[in-house]
UniProtKB/Swiss-Prot annotation:
This is LIM domain-binding protein 1. It comes from the Eukaryota. InterPro entries: LID, LIM-bd/SEUSS. Belongs to the LDB family. It is found in: Nucleus. Its main location: nucleus. Residues 302-318 have a biased composition (Low complexity). Residues 336-375 form the LIM interaction domain (LID) domain. Forms homodimers and heterodimers. One of its GO terms (biological process) is neuron differentiation.
């Protein structure tokens, strides 16, 4: 189909309108003309922009998203349907476009209220087959302004203006356009198969050619028959009956699979499934892992306090070799001593009572070097008690020699 351009100053003579059945990444594309609206008999057709050259790669980017092309392939495969197609053909069709754990959901509203049907991978082939068994000779989907989103392991396609078009030849040639929202989830791999199919139907229209109305303009009975719908909410009676049957068939898939795998009788399959379901319900919940109590660290006494408590047993001859800073007692008598508290460790395993103290002293009035050189000033320190072992002077070398022979004689 060719249409001339009405834009002023445009040199384009004609261009082709692309059907939703044609590939979106063709070799030629119609130029975009602002203010020009194009319609076909089946409804508005999306205009496909031209491909653009990727900078630095040197090749043309294929038009559109991979999800759009998968819908085109699905429409093309449905066009190959004939009345000779059997269950194997429909199963191969479903295997090509749907995952093994795919779920298909159809929602619509009838006279008695809203309906929602969800079927699994095993029942999906029969759903598409029921559309053709209901009198349809052609089926395809038209997507307008679809939105694609990338996720961790799948790609979602959300189209708020989706039209499912079916053509019926009996009792009269009728084209049924079902409008609604289509949400698909494609697995992000090489096969790009559908994992989730959710079609929410809003409204439908049934179109009849004017030529047929003109032929039966003088027949009131025929006109009354043509005025009646051949579908309910865009679905034939064959499809509606199958969806109602799926309410029973879907829960029985486990029984059928067990019967096919283990060759058990239906009664035994039902007993086994009920017993396993009862076990899952009665099984006690897994106990949560008990949190081990955090080990509390005991505060270590500082070196100075240890020496002060057991100073009577220490050898006085080695006292001068030790640094006064390390053996200095933590006493409140020392002025201007700052003790810094250590914050809790990372992870929050220790509480406030488990915080340790840093045994670092900051005293600007005390110089450790002067204490070593001046023995008298060190011994007269107010931090030392009256009975401190540091006040007693070490024995001279001659006294120590005189004590050694006495000890040897006693042995």
């Amino acid at each position: 189909m060719s249409v001339g351009c009405a834009c002023p100053g445009c040199s384009s003579k004609s261009f082709k309108l692309y059907s939703p059945k044609e590939p979106p990444n063709g070799n030629a594309f119609p130029p975009f003309h602002p203010g020009t609206m194009l319609d076909r008999d089946v409804g508005p057709t999306p205009m496909y922009p031209p491909t653009y050259l990727e900078p630095g790669i040197g090749r043309h980017t294929p038009y559109g998203n991979q999800t759009d092309y998968r819908i085109f392939e699905l429409n093309k495969r449905l066009q190959n349907w004939t009345e000779e197609c059997d269950n194997l053909w429909w199963d191969a069709f479903t295997t090509e476009f749907f995952e093994d754990d795919a779920m298909l959901t159809i929602t619509f509203c009838l006279e008695d209220g809203p309906k929602r049907y969800t079927i699994g991978r095993t029942l999906i082939p029969r759903y598409f087959r029921s559309i053709f068994e209901g009198g349809a000779t052609e089926l395809y989907y038209v997507l307008k302004h679809p939105k694609e989103s990338f996720h961790n392991n799948f790609v979602s396609l959300d189209c708020d203006q989706c039209t499912m078009v079916t053509q019926h030849g009996k009792p009269m040639f009728t084209q049924v356009c079902v409008e609604g929202r289509l949400y698909l989830e494609f697995m992000f791999d090489d096969m790009m198969r559908i994992k989730t199919w959710h079609f929410s139907i809003r409204q439908h229209r049934e179109l009849i050619p004017r030529s047929i109305l003109a032929m039966h303009a003088q027949d009131p009975q025929m006109l009354d028959q043509l005025s009646k719908n051949i579908t309910r909410c865009g679905l034939s009676n064959s499809t509606l009956n199958y969806l109602r049957l799926c309410v029973i068939l879907e829960p029985m898939q486990e029984l059928m699979s067990r019967h096919k795998t283990y060759s058990l009788s239906p009664r035994d399959c039902l007993k086994t499934c009920l017993f396993q379901k009862w076990q899952r319900m009665v099984a006690p919940p897994a106990e949560p892992a008990r949190q081990q109590p955090s080990k509390r660290r005991k505060r270590k006494m500082s070196g100075g306090s240890t020496m002060s408590s057991g100073g009577g047993n220490t050898n006085n001859s080695n006292s001068k070799k030790k640094s006064p800073a390390s053996t200095f007692a933590l006493s409140s008598q020392v002025p201007d001593v700052m003790v810094v508290g250590e914050p809790t460790l990372m992870g929050g395993e220790f509480g406030d009572e488990d915080e340790r103290l840093i045994t670092r002293l900051e005293n600007t009035q005390f110089d450790a070097a002067n204490g070593i050189d001046d023995e008298d000033s060190f011994n007269n320190s107010p931090a030392l008690g009256a009975n401190s072992p540091w006040n007693s002077k070490p024995p001279s070398s001659q006294e120590s020699k005189s004590e050694n022979p006495t000890s040897q004689a006693s042995q």
